[in-house]
A protein has these predicted regions:
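Phosphate/nucleotide-binding beta-alpha loop and adjacent structural elements of enzyme active sites
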Residues: 1-259
């Protein structure tokens, strides 16, 4: 994220910052939240709306596939991509791993766009069912989310991802523009239903607001509200939340993010 400068550069106003935060304000979920994956890093809260989900796409694997393993117990296949490792951390017949980086361009054998990675899956052609996107790619989520088509996004029922570099994005005029563009795009199809700060890193206090450097975000596609007909108000922190690093205290999401 160095191209965005630092929080000491030109800076953004408190009004601009608080306006941007409204794009991440959690809304009531049409389904109760459940936790899938480990008790620490690798576990996430998502809506309990998995019937009819046929696959999960997971850019960024590293050494954890606990979330994807939990999905296999529900018969959901996971497609994984990570060029930094040679194989999935655990073996499972419902895992499909490729040594690839997800990017905004294609280079055979190393880089592929998110749209093309998904379109390439013969197992999903001609069939119905929704998808999940679970993404933890160390800051590359921003260009990828800007690049992905609305057609591909609309195939995801649930998105759970880690946002990196928020301390730079939300305090820098260029960065906050990227943030607003990406979440305006996402909010056209999805609603944020949960936030959890990753305690791997400290928060930055800027304009009176504590900004986690890494934030877990859960979204659900807006058409799922009409299917459910119910609403479950956001509870943050949630009793199902767990610190990513067990021996460090949780980072709290302040009311600035919730109001």
């Amino acid at each position: 994220m160095s191209m965005l400068g630092t929080s000491m550069d030109i800076g953004v106003s408190e009004t601009e910052l608080r306006s941007a935060l409204k794009l991440l304000k959690p809304k009531a979920s049409p389904y109760p939240l459940i936790r899938l994956g480990s008790a620490g890093d690798g576990g996430y809260l998502i809506p309990d709306d998995l019937d009819g989900v046929v696959a999960c796409f997971s850019p960024g694997v590293a050494n954890s596939a606990d979330f994807e393993l939990a999905l296999t117990e529900r018969g959901i296949r996971s497609f994984m991509a990570d060029f930094s490792v040679s194989k999935a951390p655990i073996s499972n017949p419902l895992f499909d791993f490729e040594k690839l980086f997800i990017a905004t361009f294609n280079e055979p054998g190393k880089f592929t766009r998110l749209d093309d990675w998904i379109d390439d899956k013969k197992q999903l052609r001609g069939g119905g069912g929704d998808l999940i996107l679970q993404m933890d790619i160390e800051g590359n989520e921003w260009p990828i989310l800007a690049d992905v088509s609305y057609e591909t996004l609309s195939r995801f029922r649930i998105i759970v991802m880690e946002l990196h570099g928020l301390d730079n994005l939300l305090t820098n005029p260029l960065g906050i523009g990227i943030f607003e563009s990406v979440f305006t795009k996402l909010n056209g199809l999805f609603s944020v239903v949960h936030l959890h700060a990753n305690n791997c890193c400290h928060s930055l206090e800027y304009r009176g607001v504590k900004i986690p450097r890494v934030l877990e975000v859960t979204l659900i596609r807006n058409d799922r509200y009409s299917v459910s007909g119910k609403l479950y108000e956001p509870v943050i922190p949630n009793s199902l939340d767990s610190p990513n690093i067990p021996n460090k205290p949780e980072l709290q999401i302040t009311r600035d993010w919730l109001s």
